[in-house]
């Protein structure tokens, strides 16, 4: 299992099931979220696949957040008004099966989140992980200045402050919000 969260609010979990026995093994894999419970369809790379969706309002009702979740070869399953993604998998003797689940929290104000959701849903496991790592490393190479200081503790503090500025900045420039200027709020995002 390899998990990552892309900077555009897209969470990806890649899985490889390996069967070391001499017989095929059949299992059912399920993925669910309290945020995405309505079944639907999404087109990924020209092919239709099952998707779960849901909506919720942001604090103070500033925008609507759309939860979207899909997985390779998954179908919707339900019971008592609750829905999840399910997939029957047969892992061949001595073989492996790969698949992934992708979930995103999208808004109309951040169209890149929808673009990245569809992009990662269409990539294979290895391609998805490689793409995320390359983009993550490039992001830091472009945004973290190189400052040479003799003490590692000072370097760590500098790196931390730059990380803090990049990931705890709030730019809430959406209609109806009174404070529409970027601000740094330490600790607000975790």
What is each stretch, according to the model?
Residues 1-85, 89, 116-134:
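Polysaccharide-binding surfaces and accessory modules of carbohydrate-active proteins
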Residues 10-12, 25-27, 89-109:
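Short Pro-Gly-centered flexible turn/kink motifs
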Residues 21, 33-37, 105-109, 164, ...:
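Short loop/turn segments at secondary-structure transitions that flank enzyme active sites
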Residues 113:
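Short, surface-exposed ligand- or partner-binding patches at beta-edge/loop junctions that are enriched
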């Amino acid at each position: 299992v390899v998990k990552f969260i892309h900077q555009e609010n897209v969470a990806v979990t890649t899985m490889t099931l390996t069967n070391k026995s001499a017989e095929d093994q059949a299992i059912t894999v399920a993925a669910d979220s309290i945020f995405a419970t309505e079944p639907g369809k999404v087109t990924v790379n020209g092919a239709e696949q099952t998707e779960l969706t849901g909506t919720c309002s942001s604090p103070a009702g500033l925008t609507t957040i759309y939860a979207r979740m899909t997985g390779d070869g998954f179908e919707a399953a339900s019971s008592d008004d609750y829905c999840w993604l399910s997939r029957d998998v047969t892992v061949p003797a001595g073989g492996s099966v790969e698949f992934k689940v992708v979930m995103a929290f999208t808004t109309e104000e951040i169209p890149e989140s929808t673009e990245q959701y569809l992009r990662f849903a269409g990539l294979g496991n290895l391609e998805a992980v490689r793409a995320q790592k390359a983009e993550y490393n490039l992001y830091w190479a472009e945004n973290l200045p190189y400052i040479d200081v003799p003490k590692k503790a000072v370097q760590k503090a500098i790196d931390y402050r730059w990380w803090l500025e990049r990931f705890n900045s709030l730019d809430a420039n959406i209609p109806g919000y009174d404070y529409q200027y970027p601000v740094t709020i330490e600790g607000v995002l975790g």
